[in-house]
Amino acid sequence: MSAEKKQNLQDTFLNSVRKSKTPLTIFLVNGVKLQGVVSWFDNFCVLLRRDGQSQLVYKHAISTIMPAQPVQLYEPSADADD
């Protein structure tokens, strides 16, 4: 796999929940709980949307991200046995 096509787990996860509009609960390092849907992200922040309002959350402030439903990060290959 070439270097420009390789994506890290964080970007793969955030892109997946963004595309599927999966509701998330985000816990910050100070204990604050935020809920919403990811509408955009980059290397430093996440744009969370809820009830027509947007919140820009810096990634260094995030402790945990919990999706409301399971997230499939890859397509299982047809010849995979497990």
Swiss-Prot record:
InterPro entries: Hfq (IPR005001), LSM_dom_sf (IPR010920), Sm (IPR047575)
Keywords assigned: RNA-binding, Stress response
Coiled-coil segments: none
Gene Ontology cellular component terms for the protein in this record: cytosol
Domain of life: Bacteria
GO MF, any single term: RNA binding
Gene3D superfamilies: 2.30.30.100
Listed Pfam families: Hfq
Signal peptide, first to last residue: none
Ranges of residues in domain Sm: 11-71
GO biological process, one term: regulation of DNA-templated transcription
Family statement: Belongs to the Hfq family.
Subunit-structure text: Homohexamer.
Function: RNA chaperone that binds small regulatory RNA (sRNAs) and mRNAs to facilitate mRNA translational regulation in response to envelope stress, environmental stress and changes in metabolite concentrations. Also binds with high specificity to tRNAs.
Descriptive protein name: RNA-binding protein Hfq
Species this chain originates from: Caulobacter vibrioides (strain ATCC 19089 / CIP 103742 / CB 15)
